[in-house]
């Protein structure tokens, strides 16, 4: 396994994202937990604040194809594909590629990209309905750390099982007390937020062989509101 940012081409805000204890409250987290319209297309403090396709994933598709040697003959799975934006762009790049997605949100599936809606399956992230070693690449962005520790372990084991060894996951993490505090202020769905060294132990436990990247306060450019 290696630490590697397969999302390096994804646009990041240049200005800090200011967070604090009274911006995203328990009411916002309750709303987000339903993963319905409020989370995807409602108020920004409840989730995305409008989750619309804008083509920003196209650059990610190109870089991932180079990073992982993906071609039209590859098989790809995205765990937690939401509205299928990344899958859609892969489908446009390689129309004959075997593409599959899983999602737990009925709203996201109902409002997913028409081009890939037929290949999105509703299922738990801990029980993927696929054969062993079925996919050349398995992707899970913003998924694993929204689960309990037990389910995060099960999800990683499933990613390892259905893939052929190549995968990419993001993990909610911190390196110090400040980072932990800022990430807690920011996250709506984060359930397992660990120190980077603790995540390494989890990955070793499941025999993970793919790539991982830490979603942290530094990565997100979070800053604390003062005064």
Question: Regions from the language model: what does each represent?
Answer:
Residues 142-146:
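Short catalytic micro-motifs in class I SAM-dependent methyltransferases
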């Amino acid at each position: 396994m290696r630490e590697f940012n397969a999302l390096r081409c994804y646009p990041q805000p240049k200005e800090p994202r200011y967070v604090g204890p009274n911006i995203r409250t328990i009411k916002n987290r309750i709303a987000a937990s339903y993963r319905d319209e409020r989370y995807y297309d409602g108020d920004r403090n409840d989730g995305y604040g409008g989750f619309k396709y804008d083509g920003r994933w196209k650059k990610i598709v190109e870089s991932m194809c180079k990073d992982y040697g993906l071609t039209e003959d590859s098989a790809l799975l995205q765990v937690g594909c939401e509205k299928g934006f990344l899958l859609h762009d892969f489908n446009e790049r390689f129309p004959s590629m075997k593409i599959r997605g899983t999602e737990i949100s009925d709203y996201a599936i109902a409002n997913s990209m028409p081009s890939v809606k037929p290949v999105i399956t509703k299922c738990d992230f801990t029980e993927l309905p696929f054969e062993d070693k079925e996919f050349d690449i398995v992707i899970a962005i913003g998924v694993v750390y929204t689960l309990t520790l037990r389910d995060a372990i099960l999800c990683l084991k499933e990613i390892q099982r259905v893939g052929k060894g190549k995968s990419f996951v993001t993990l909610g993490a911190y390196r110090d007390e400040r980072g932990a505090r800022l990430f807690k202020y920011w996250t709506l769905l984060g359930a397992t937020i660990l120190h980077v060294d603790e995540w390494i132990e989890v990955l070793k436990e499941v025999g993970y062989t793919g790539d991982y990247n830490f979603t942290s306060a530094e990565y997100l450019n979070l800053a604390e509101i003062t005064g």
